[in-house]
């Protein structure tokens, strides 16, 4: 199916209203909003002006975005710090905002989550060879974004009993 529809272009004023609704629905990054504004057919100067305005009105707040991203990915998906940082960087979030977002993670709960994931995966892992099993568990936890030193400590604890 060919798409001959021409993307409607908006005036900066119309785009501001649409972008405000887009940001009000859920937290957005500057990068996401910038892409949306360009899709409205705006000129680069107008896009940057609207980004500044939306930021001043707190409709775009990257620190708040980072905090809610961390709460979601850590709280629901049990991602580790490394995977969360990588996800935020890919969305163009500054190092400062990433650092602020990571403060949402309770260090004690973080290790409990790691141990819980390890025990759950260990219970379902079919590999009998201890070396291969350890390697599979390590890969799994690293894919979840946990730090290798914490993984090694957790594995030692599991093996000791």
Provide a role label for each language-model segment.
Residues 1-161:
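An alpha-helical, amphipathic repeat domain used for nucleic-acid recognition
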